[in-house]
């Protein structure tokens, strides 16, 4: 098997190509499952490397490396889609599409896995098993991973272990550092909620002749905070946030309805906390609405489970990343105290099916000029770390397969 230092050199030599892939994707961001240009770039690159990429699900792509020697199967995931966000980063390769931006670094992930695909193809005879390369859409809406699983992602050949990386910007970490979590739940579950409050609209000068849904919705929003502060265990983790509130279109008209959208996050795999939040949100929304002569509908959707990291696989990952990067790979447990993060990731669906590890790659901090974090319109990512991500994906696959015959 190729030595770690030689692999890093080979990955470093790919840097111009990695940056070209990443910056092309960054200029042309696409969201959700609607990724025609992104998918075309991925399939073209894979085909030119000698792969036969296959469609998987609504918009996913998979390809296989190795398979010439018997062994297990390891999955490497790169998500592809952008956010519905207006870019303000100031990068020379900023989004050319209004209202769309690679603000979470998925362009980086796609480029890194394409780089790994190239290195794996060049060392295909050394692969003791099979590497399945996954390019996933719709992570941001928590639908892409499950769609690909339902379309056979983990079968033919059957996957034995799964790996993902996520870049981090704006964190106080040296660029290029790899963080490996311990085992157990590392990220929260997430689901969407939508509350519609129905009243009776009319002229703003005659509120007495109307039933104002805005007033009712505002009181519902305030009343819901009691669930967080008075009904959930302070020692646990359960939080919901209303991030969008819409009502009316004109300043002098009381509308017929008001809408609220938000997210619920917990770290309870049995969903008991989620069930309590569902019950109490519905009771409070409908009860407060009634008090203000309105009605309320509450809907929950797009559930994504907690991310569960396999403890033995995480141990393998820390060993391999240390072999590759030395002190620039670290156990992130001292940073987190072993507690799950509040963010969510739909690769969690895979983690409930096969042993999985989700790692992080630092891609710029404030001292280096990378001030903003993910999902901010001004976020920037240091793409000089791409080769490290490519090397990390590649080494993880080769090393794990060699050790798990």
What role is predicted for each listed range?
Residues 25, 63, 76, 106, ...:
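Divalent metal-coordination and catalytic microenvironments
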Residues 2, 218-405:
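Metal-dependent amide/peptide-bond hydrolase catalytic core
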Residues 2-102, 107, 111-128:
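Acidic/His- and Gly-rich active-site-bordering loop/insert found
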Residues 85-92, 184-189, 317, 364-373:
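Short, flexible, mixed-charge acidic loops at enzyme active sites
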Residues 77, 86, 193-195, 358-364:
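Non-cysteine beta-strand/loop elements that form the S-adenosyl-L-methionine
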Residues 83, 90-101, 108, 120-255, ...:
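Histidine/acidic-residue-rich, glycine-tolerant segments that coordinate divalent metal ions
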Residues 26-28, 102, 106-109, 166, ...:
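Histidine-centered active-site/metal-ligand motif
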């Amino acid at each position: 098997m190729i030595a770690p230092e030689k692999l890093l050199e080979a990955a470093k030599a790919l840097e111009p190509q990695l940056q070209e892939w990443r910056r092309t994707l960054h200029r042309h961001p696409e969201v959700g499952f609607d990724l025609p240009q992104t998918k075309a770039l991925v399939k073209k690159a894979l085909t030119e490397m000698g792969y036969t990429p296959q469609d998987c699900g609504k918009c996913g792509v998979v390809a296989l490396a190795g398979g010439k020697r018997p062994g297990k199967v390891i999955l490497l995931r790169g998500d592809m889609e952008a956010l519905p966000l207006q870019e303000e980063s100031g990068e020379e390769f900023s989004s050319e599409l209004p209202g769309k931006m690679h603000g979470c670094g998925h362009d980086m992930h796609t480029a890194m896995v394409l780089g790994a695909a190239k290195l794996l193809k060049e060392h295909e005879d050394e692969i003791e098993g099979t590497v399945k390369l996954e390019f996933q859409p719709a992570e941001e809406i928590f639908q892409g991973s499950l769609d690909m699983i339902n379309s056979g992602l983990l079968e033919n050949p059957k996957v034995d272990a799964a790996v993902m990386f996520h870049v981090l910007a704006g964190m106080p970490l040296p660029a290029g550092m790899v963080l490996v979590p311990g085992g157990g739940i590392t990220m929260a579950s997430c689901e969407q909620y939508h509350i519609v409050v129905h009243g009776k609209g009319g002229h703003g000068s005659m509120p007495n002749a109307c039933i104002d849904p805005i007033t009712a919705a505002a009181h519902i929003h305030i009343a819901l905070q009691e669930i967080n502060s008075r009904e959930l265990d302070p020692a646990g983790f359960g939080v919901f946030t209303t991030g969008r509130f819409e009502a009316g279109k004109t300043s002098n008209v009381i509308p017929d309805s008001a809408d609220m959208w938000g997210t619920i996050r917990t770290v309870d795999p049995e969903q008991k906390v989620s069930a309590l939040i569902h019950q109490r949100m519905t009771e409070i929304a409908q009860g407060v609405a009634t008090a203000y002569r309105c009605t309320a509908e509450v809907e929950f959707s797009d559930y994504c489970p907690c991310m569960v990291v396999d403890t033995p696989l995480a141990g393998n990952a820390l060993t391999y990343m240390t072999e590759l990067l030395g002190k620039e790979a670290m156990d992130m447990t001292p940073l987190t105290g072993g507690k799950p993060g509040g963010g969510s990731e739909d690769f969690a669906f895979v983690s409930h099916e096969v042993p999985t590890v989700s790692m992080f790659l630092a891609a710029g901090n404030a001292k280096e000029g990378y001030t903003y974090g993910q999902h901010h319109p001004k976020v920037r990512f240091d793409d000089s770390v791409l080769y490290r991500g490519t090397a990390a994906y590649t080494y993880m696959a080769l090393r794990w397969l060699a050790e798990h015959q």
